[in-house]
Amino acid sequence: DDLGDAQRRAADWLLDVTRTGAGTHLLVYPAAGMQPAMRATKRRATVDVLTSDVDQISHMREALVLEGADDSIHVERIPGVVPNPKQWRGHYDAIVTVEKVEQLSPQERKEYIRAVDRFLTPNGRAGIQSLVATEAMTDAGKASIQALRAYVWPALDYPLTAELHQLVDKNSNLRIVSETHVGTHYLESLRQQRSFFDGHLREAAAAGFDPVFRRLWTFQFALREALMTLGMIDAVQFGLAHRNRGGRR
């Protein structure tokens, strides 16, 4: 289907950014879905997926069994959004994050990028997909996000691209080595997601999602679609590498 194809393409682009291939040890963190992990197994990579969401873990593991990928992908629970060095010690050739940075508080963003720095091997690559604010963002646009912050993502804040560069430069030994704007692709994906959800409202109701939740989910798709159509937000894939071959400072 069109939506599935779009999601697979976006995942493949991030895997290309991180040079994921046969033998790569990939970390998907924090988990936002299984598409990057599933696509990585097609390249014969070994994948760890980290999440702090207990409910998400059971759904992910069920999906892995259905796909026959439970031998190549390992889903692990971490105590919080960002694990400290004692809670997770792994080192990885590649790290992928999809649309999580914008949902973190300012302090969590700093801790997150330090964790990526810590987890990434000296010659590894990280790929981060994030929604960002553009110079076209207005006060009205910012105000509209308050609803998403109140009911969906409490810490939601779309950073400027320059702010993400500053985050990386000031809090890690990493640097952004590539930046690809994929807003046009993302906008079409949003439209497809909204259409798919609207076409399956009965199934959502049967699964236990009440009318308020269903309307809220349709609203968040429509709002993000509107902000992107107006050019107030963009979708960007960043490629990161260590500044020197020595890796972590």
Residues of each region from the PLM?
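A short glycine-rich, Lys/Arg-flanked "PGG" loop and its adjoining helix->strand segment in the class I
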Residues: 110-125
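A short acidic, Gly/Pro-enriched loop at the edge of an enzyme's catalytic core
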Residues: 83-96
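Conserved SAM-binding strand-loop segment of SAM-dependent methyltransferases
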Residues: 67-84
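Conserved alpha-helix/loop element of class I SAM-dependent methyltransferases that forms part
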Residues: 1-25
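Helix-to-beta-strand junctions that scaffold the AdoMet/dcAdoMet cofactor pocket
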Residues: 69, 104-105, 120-121
